[in-house]
Amino acid sequence: TFVVRVRKVKDFAPNLISMKLEQKLGELILNKVKEAKVNLHTPEKTFFGVITQDKFVFGLKAAEILPKPFVERRPRRRPFFHPSAVQAKLARCMVNLAQPKEDDLVVDPFCGTASMLIEAGLIGCRVMGSDVRKQMIYGSLENLSHFGIEPEGMILADAKHLPIVSADCIVTDPPYGRSATTLGWSTRRIVEKFLSNACDVIPNRRRICMASPKSIRISSIGEEFGFRHLESHFVYVHRSLTREITVLEKI
């Protein structure tokens, strides 16, 4: 048994009705596989399609992540809260973009409240973090413990001078915006200094996923320091801030 589901991203293909496309695709599958039957409620297989700009992505759903656990890990639900904390779903997205393997060491040099480390730890990675503020180190330890994650270490250190010699990948969100502390440095200078050191820490063909204001143009900074820019995604926060989520690969 099977079902076909189609979703639109934003307002792309406004004249296309998702339900009609689901029906047409279902008919094609029924014509190809004679023993197949439609089951809208408890199907054995779910075919899933996404309509986006100039593309239709279609395939068989292999797994599903329920939204409730992400809600339960929202920053305000954690023991230690700070307004600059990254939401759990975005943190998991960034960890996934860095493509760590199980038991890899994932490092966040600007760990804040440990959003990235929590998500990496929950998928079986070893984690280590650092922050220039003692309050954040203690808060991160509290949050990690709350989710049953034991870090390899938490270091009070300035990420402009990385306190580690190696990591399998880095996932991080440097300070910027209204609630963050930059200790008098511009965000661009912080990113430049961090990336100049990070190129000596991760192996070739491994990744850094980091966020920054769109205006910083982090992809071009990464290329200056020996990284290949793989992809960028933009997240609107408010009128004066759009985040660029950038994936860089060491070459």
What are these regions (language model features)?
Residues 9-16, 20-23, 35, 42-251:
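Class I S-adenosyl-L-methionine-dependent methyltransferase catalytic core
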